[in-house]
């Protein structure tokens, strides 16, 4: 009996202590999503330009060149629906302006893509319907003029240092060899299109035109065989690498994609230290925007981002209170977003590690880093000369003032103090 009583007392004591611990210790918080940033490309569009011998000129396209098509609108509406499903329980099912902020480049196709996306993401509820026959509500999309956009329109410029890096890239063996290997092919394309300047850097225009025409069921010219179009596609992908890589990728990133990445990291850090809105920040932009960002992150797959593709940043608060970042890339509407792994970090990357690993591509002063070394030195010399000139000018003014006052004193007797005056 005594042994049983002792065992019972120990069990009761353990239960009592466990109850006390649960009372004193705060409950463990489950891992939770705190903030999402999206960067997506616009949807299907008409060609941005064409070539002189193209039988399909601008009047062939209902809204002209570079405009979002009905297919593009549907692509983004479907992406909005997919995002609505992915973030069910995180975002409100109806639009709340405090939760969402959308910024777009100032192009019709990106603005309209954002609007179509929001229509899929936030269909109006009963209270938000302004017309019972219209299942849509206006949601603001913010932008700045193209000439002032230093966040989403790439490549950023003017930037003399970046142009210098591009000139150096043209001298690399990879670029030179690619030019030699494709010289005859580029000449053929120039002859068939009527273009006078077809290079590795401009060939994407030809591919883009043919791709858009083929996508919309237009008959391609005989010279644009499947093999030719495939080769054009490969050179188009090379032109993206030329913009942001091949040579001095980190330096290029500091002047290009690192600018956007810096803003994204700033937002992630802010959301980890405050509980402010919004929950969702959206950027509507271009394939070059996605390439610039992904090259800065060193996660680019070497292929042009398809229409309505979407790079996702998700900020989580772990059960221990720390924060982590996960990235995904949705480049196929029929598949789940593909996990992206920042080199040197697991997919669930601690926020502090994410910041540390990306620091080399974050510019400290973009304007200053864009200047050439000689320009910086010349500026310093000019400033020094300006300072010296100002000092010399002040000395001359002071000297002239003294001389003027001396000459202004009237002639006659002047008292001269002797020693007794200072006794």
UniProtKB/Swiss-Prot annotation:
Disulfide pattern: 159-370, 212-310, 345-349
Residues bearing attached sugar chains per UniProt: 92, 133, 167, 177, 191, 197, 267, 322, 331, 374
E.C. no: 3.1.3.2
GO biological process: lysosome organization; skeletal system development
InterPro entries per record: Acid_Pase_AS, His_Pase_clade-2, His_PPase_superfam, Histidine_acid_phosphatase
Compartments, as annotated in UniProt: Lysosome membrane; Lysosome lumen
Bilayer topology term: Single-pass membrane protein
PROSITE patterns on file: HIS_ACID_PHOSPHAT_1, HIS_ACID_PHOSPHAT_2
PTM: The membrane-bound form is converted to the soluble form by sequential proteolytic processing. First, the C-terminal cytoplasmic tail is removed. Cleavage by a lysosomal protease releases the soluble form in the lysosome lumen.
Pfam families xref list: His_Phos_2
N-terminal signal peptide: 1-30
Bilayer-spanning residue ranges: 382-402
Family according to the record: Belongs to the histidine acid phosphatase family.
Protein name: Lysosomal acid phosphatase
Organism: Mus musculus (Mouse)
UniProt lineage: Eukaryota, Metazoa, Chordata, Craniata, Vertebrata
